[in-house]
Amino acid sequence: GYLSHPERRYPVIFAFQGIPGSVDAYQQNLPVGQIIPSLVSAQRIRDAIVVVPTVFPNNLDTECVDSADGSVRMDTFVSSDLVAWAKANLRTVDRPDAWATLGFSAGGWCSSMLTLRHPETFGYSLSLSGYFQIRFNGSALRPDGDPVYDLGRIASEQAPSVKLWFWTAKDDSAPYDSVQQFAPKVRAPTVLTVALVEAGGHSWAVWTAGTQAGLQWLGENSAQFAWVAS
């Protein structure tokens, strides 16, 4: 582990919760501190640093964006301030293919959005039942049709060199419909991989299986996350 190998640098995963929810989800419902070591033991992925920020303070639906009026700057906090903190204070591998995002539900949107908007930092996104069109549950922090956070536009016009992995149940209509609408807009070098399960709805069972599957996919698709002998 991290403390046992002070000479070693590690890839990084930024993990985002849903709303309503809390960062505790990644200890209780999706215990990445147990899931990753089990995958390391199975030689499917290497050890990684996981950073779990609060992106919905007091369940305020920020959608991880910078608001139009400047009152909320969650995008800047995560992609600039928190990234800089992690690089300065943790033994990270400083290259985009060693940085991934992970999120479920609204956190899945954050994962896809932050990776598409900041390919200089994040090379991979793992979205569990997320979506690709911004949707505020409460006050809208950005105007309708805002091009800054239009992921379809970014994927088709800018085509950042990132890999997106999307997992959902077919009977979870909002995420399923969202990825169907987004997929045709993706062009190279952006890559979208969609993994579907037949049923399960918007649930922890789906996301638990998806976390396992997504991390294995990450280990298979990034040399920086691929398993290496200790």
Annotate the PLM regions.
Residues G1-S230:
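Non-catalytic cap/lid and distal C-terminal segments of serine-dependent acyl enzymes
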